[in-house]
């Protein structure tokens, strides 16, 4: 983090992969990339440019790389703020798996619901 802070202060482009504050692990929630980005943002007083979920660039590049249409894709994830928002913001169907970061109890209050919701990937059939 020290090297990143010094580089940004000297004019380096500040790129963040994603704004995930936490990542779920077997041991509980641990700091995610967004926590580190926020630390560096505070230290440098510089806003990052995000290139990962939920930004369009990552979805557009993935779809182009696969050579498919949006209608043939579904965004699967356990984090509403990044995974599912990637689908919603980019016109792609989404499947929220509630066994990870976003709990099932949060689904009724989400501002824009995912296309599909399952408790576990074991329930997903296509």
Model-based region annotation:
Residues 1-126:
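Asp-based, Mg2+/Mn2+-dependent phosphohydrolase catalytic module
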């Amino acid at each position: 983090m020290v090297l990143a802070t010094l580089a940004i202060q000297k004019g380096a482009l500040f790129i963040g992969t994603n704004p995930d504050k936490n990542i779920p692990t077997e041991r509980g929630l641990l700091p995610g990339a967004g926590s580190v980005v926020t630390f560096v943002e505070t230290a440098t007083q510089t806003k990052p440019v995000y290139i990962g979920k939920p930004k369009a660039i990552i979805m557009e590049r993935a779809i182009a790389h696969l050579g498919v249409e949006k209608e043939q894709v579904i965004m699967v994830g356990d984090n509403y703020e990044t995974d599912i928002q990637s689908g919603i913001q980019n016109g792609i169907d989404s499947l929220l798996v509630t066994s990870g970061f976003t709990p099932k109890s949060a689904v009724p209050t989400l501002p824009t619901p995912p296309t599909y919701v399952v408790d576990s990937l074991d329930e997903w059939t296509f």
